[in-house]
Amino acid sequence: MTDRDRQPEDTTAPTGEPVVSKPYIMPDDPEPGSVELLQKEAAEARDRMLRTLAEMENLRKRTTKEVADARLYGITGFARDVLDIADNLQRALDAVPAEARAAADPGLTSLIEGVELTERSLLNALEKHGVKKFDPQGQKFDPNFQQAMFEVPDASVPAGTVVQVMQAGYTIGERVLRPALVGVAKGGAKAASAANSNEVN
């Protein structure tokens, strides 16, 4: 091949003519009513989107509440089991009469103090985890927090007043873990005044 047969490479600069692309062809006029149809579809899509956003927000709130409840109330079963231990410690202390405590030798006194400290420590540990003891002695009977075991005829207190607590109650958060077992006054001030008015007549 000779130099003549070779084609010279095109080393010239582009000529400055713009590159022309194919023109955009507008579609035919839209069908009558298609604008309204598109607006309706857009409104429906917007409505679905807003509903989905609301559902997601409700789900987020519900999940946050469930996580908080799980943290607070997750130990409910364990706490109920531990309450039996607290009750047994209290029963052990109640089994020793006050006279025996006063006349007790140092060994028995140390044992009683040890049981008291153990009970106090157990109740403090429960309280750290949201379990609180309540003693409704002298309060008006509330069936949401107490379970009436018997009625006591006592005219010195108003009817429906808790006069004896057989077993203390416990709450966890805002829920009742175990209701207090109580004795409730029957009759009382209102019943006594009604009985007096009957005697006068």
Swiss-Prot record:
Coarse class of the protein's main subcellular location: cytoplasm
Its biological purpose: Participates actively in the response to hyperosmotic and heat shock by preventing the aggregation of stress-denatured proteins, in association with DnaK and GrpE. It is the nucleotide exchange factor for DnaK and may function as a thermosensor. Unfolded proteins bind initially to DnaJ; upon interaction with the DnaJ-bound protein, DnaK hydrolyzes its bound ATP, resulting in the formation of a stable complex. GrpE releases ADP from DnaK; ATP binding to DnaK triggers the release of the substrate protein, thus completing the reaction cycle.
Lineage: Bacteria, Pseudomonadati, Pseudomonadota, Alphaproteobacteria, Hyphomicrobiales
Subunit structure: Homodimer.
CDD domains reported in the protein's UniProt record: GrpE (cd00446)
Annotated Gene Ontology cellular component terms: cytoplasm
PANTHER family given in the database record: GRPE PROTEIN, GRPE PROTEIN HOMOLOG, MITOCHONDRIAL
Gene Ontology MF terms: adenyl-nucleotide exchange factor activity; protein homodimerization activity; protein-folding chaperone binding; unfolded protein binding
InterPro entries, per database record: GrpE, GrpE_coiled_coil, GrpE_head
Subcellular location: Cytoplasm
Official protein name in the record: Protein GrpE
Top-rank taxon, per record: Bacteria
Presence of the UniProt keyword Cytoplasm in the record: yes
One BP term from GO: protein folding
Keywords: Chaperone, Cytoplasm, Stress response
Family the UniProt entry places it in: Belongs to the GrpE family.
Chain residue ranges for the region called Disordered: 1-32
Record-linked Pfam families: GrpE
NCBIfam families assigned to the protein according to its UniProt record, in alphabetical order: PRK14141.1
